[in-house]
């Protein structure tokens, strides 16, 4: 179980994860806690904002929301 902040879409149905090669990012549907365990989880809000801005500047992602991963785990527990 992770803790910290993740980047997800506005309806909280997809979460940002690293690709298996760890050279890019992809949005995965939040269907189980296994997906949340694979999510790119950042320890603090400042770091999450910096990563979000960097990804937007490089046009790798669109607008994403920063949420506490515990909020997503509540869907399953």
What positions do the PLM features span?
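Short aromatic-glycine-(Arg/Gly/Cys) micro-motifs in beta-strand/loop hairpins
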Residues: 1-38, 64
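Short, mixed-charge low-complexity intrinsically disordered segments
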Residues: 36-77
């Amino acid at each position: 179980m992770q803790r910290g902040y993740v980047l997800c879409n506005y309806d909280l149905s997809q979460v940002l994860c690293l690709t298996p090669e760890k050279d890019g990012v992809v949005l995965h549907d939040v269907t189980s806690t296994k997906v949340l365990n694979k999510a790119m989880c950042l320890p603090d809000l400042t770091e999450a904002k910096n990563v979000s801005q960097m990804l937007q500047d490089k046009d790798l992602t669109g607008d994403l929301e920063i949420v506490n991963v515990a909020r997503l785990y509540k869907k399953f527990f």
